[in-house]
Amino acid sequence: MSESENTEKRWGVAHVHASFNNTLITVTDLTGAETIVKSSGGAVVKQNRDEASPYAAMQMAESVAEDIKAAGIDGLHVRVRGPGGNGNKSPGPGAQATIRALARAGLEIGRIEDVTPIPHDGTRAPKNSRL
């Protein structure tokens, strides 16, 4: 058995928070205690309106992938989070672009899970005011 087959892959967890105003990527170790690299939409585009765009998400994911590979991580588990709460439960436009760009950068994607916060009958939802 060669040495390359015997080496075990190092995994990390990519926490992707994709709202409709911005996209944040934070890569941690498996426990979530140590942050390896993080990036946001504002770090790669100039206009505020472009922070949540798929283009910004792709640029972020490519730069994050380079840093991850330099840190020696080969694979990622992806946790996607939308706005949640009383707001919209679906993730923003940057979520799918982020996952595609990470996979295209040569990282192995393990699990993709949705961790959008869902209220268990929390605060009262806003109603229309009737006159």
Curated annotation (Swiss-Prot):
Keyword terms = Ribonucleoprotein, Ribosomal protein, RNA-binding, rRNA-binding
Q: Which GO terms describe its biological process?
A: translation
SS bond list? none
One Gene Ontology MF term: structural constituent of ribosome
Query: Which Pfam families does UniProt cross-reference here?
Result: Ribosomal_S11
One GO term of the cellular component aspect?
Answer: ribonucleoprotein complex
**Is this entry keyworded rRNA-binding?**
yes
Say if the entry is tagged with keyword RNA-binding: yes
InterPro entries membership:
Ribosomal_uS11, Ribosomal_uS11_archaeal, Ribosomal_uS11_CS, Ribosomal_uS11_sf
Which HAMAP family does the entry link to? Ribosomal_uS11
Role of this protein: Located on the platform of the 30S subunit.
**Member of which family?**
Belongs to the universal ribosomal protein uS11 family.
Database matches in NCBIfam families: arch_S11P (TIGR03628), PRK09607.1 (NF007176)
Under the subunit heading, UniProt states: Part of the 30S ribosomal subunit.
Name it.
Answer: Small ribosomal subunit protein uS11
- Species per Swiss-Prot/TrEMBL record: Haloquadratum walsbyi (strain DSM 16790 / HBSQ001)
Q: Highest lineage ranks of the organism?
A: Archaea, Methanobacteriati, Methanobacteriota, Stenosarchaea group, Halobacteria
